[in-house]
Amino acid sequence: MSEEENAKEAIVVDNGSGVVKAGFAGENQPCSVFPSVVAKPKTKQVIVGGAGNKDCFVGDERQQKRGVCTLSYPIKSGMIKDWDGMQKIWDYTFYNELRIETENHPVLLTEAPLNPKQNRENMCRIMFEEYDFPSMYIQIQAVLSLYSAGRTTGIVVDSGDGVTHVVPIFEGYQIPHAIEKILLAGRDLTDYMCRILKDDDYHFETTAEKETVRDIKEKLCYVADDYEAELKKAGEGGELEESYALPDGRPLKISTQRFQCPEFLFQPDLGGRECKSVHQLTYDSIMTCDLDVRKDLYANIILSGGTTMFPGLGERLYKEMKDLAPQTMKVKVIASPDRKYAVWRGGSTLAKLSTFAGMWVTKEDYAEFGESIVHRKCI
C-alpha cells in the first residue's frame, strides 16, 4: 500500500515484551514483526551503521551488531520501564518499518492488563507531542484477543515472551480484581530449555546461542497430554527423537526435552519456580469472578500469544480445566491457528469499525484536557 492510498489509515502497534507487531488497520496480519530490543554499543565509541553513525540499533538491525552491543528490553513483564528505549522502538516502527508520516494517521496502541495510570498518560503524551499523531487510542491486549476470537465475554490466557496473564472479560470490560499473572513465559522456557540441554553436554550461553535454542523450542517442542506417560513412553524407546541442524552444521538430537520444556507452564516446580501453573491460574481467576459469569468464562477460554503456540497446549489446558471445573460445567478452549497475532488482529478489526470513529482521543481532546483524558476515553 502506498502512503497516498494509506493516508488516514489507522496504525495498530502491539508492543510486546519480546516482539513488536505493527501494521495498518483492516489487514489480517501485521506487516512488521521485529524484536522489542534496543542494542547499544558496549563502548562509548559510536558504531558506523548503514545510515551513518548510530548510538543504538533496534529490531532486526541489532542482529548484525550483536557481538559489540549490549541488548536491553524496554518492556519488562508487559510494562514499559525504559521510555527512552521505547521511543527508539517507536521511531523504528513508524519511520523505518511502516514508513509513514505520523501526522496523517491515527494510532492504536496496546497495553498490558493493570497498566499503571502514569504509563498510559506517558503513552498519550508521547504520541501527541513527539509524533504529532492526529488521534490515538490505548486498548488492553486481552480485550483485543477476545475481539479477534469474535467474542465480548470470555477468559483470555495470554502468554508472550515476558509474562503470562489470565484476564476474565465480561461484555468487553476486564474484571480487574480477578486478573492473574505469573512472570513465567517464553523467555523463561528458552532459559529452561538451555538448562535441560546442558544436562546433555550442550552449552548455550551467548545471545546468539540462546536465539538458536528459542528456534529449537518453537520448531520441535510440544505439550504432552500426560507428562508421566510421555516420559514412560520415551524410556521404552518411543519415537520421540528429532534432529536439529545447529548453525555450525552439527546435528543436535533432542527427545524428552521436546515436551519437558513447555511442561514448565503446567509444573513450574520442574524449573524451580514457586508460582501457579497456567491451569491453576485460569481456574483461580474464574473462581474469583461472580457466580453468574463463570459458566460463560469456562465455555470461552481463549488462547493468545506466541507461547501458547505449542502443539497440544490447548488440549492439555482443556484436560486440566475439565479436572478442576465442576463436573456439570461445559469447558471449551479456543486456540486459533494464528493466535500469536490475536492481539494485533483484534486491534486491526476495532480500529476499522465505523462505530469506533468517535472513540479516538483526538489532539483537540488532549489540548483541552491533557493526558488524563486517556482514562476517560480509553476504558
From Swiss-Prot:
CDD domains according to UniProt: ASKHA_NBD_actin_Arp-T1-3
GO cellular component, one term: cytoskeleton
GO molecular function, one term: ATP binding
Places the protein is found: Cytoplasm, Cytoskeleton
EC numbers, comma separated: 3.6.4.-
Keyword ATP-binding listed: yes
One Pfam entry name: Actin
Main location: cytoplasm
Function: Actins are highly conserved proteins that are involved in various types of cell motility and are ubiquitously expressed in all eukaryotic cells.
Family: Belongs to the actin family.
Protein name per UniProt: Actin, cytoplasmic
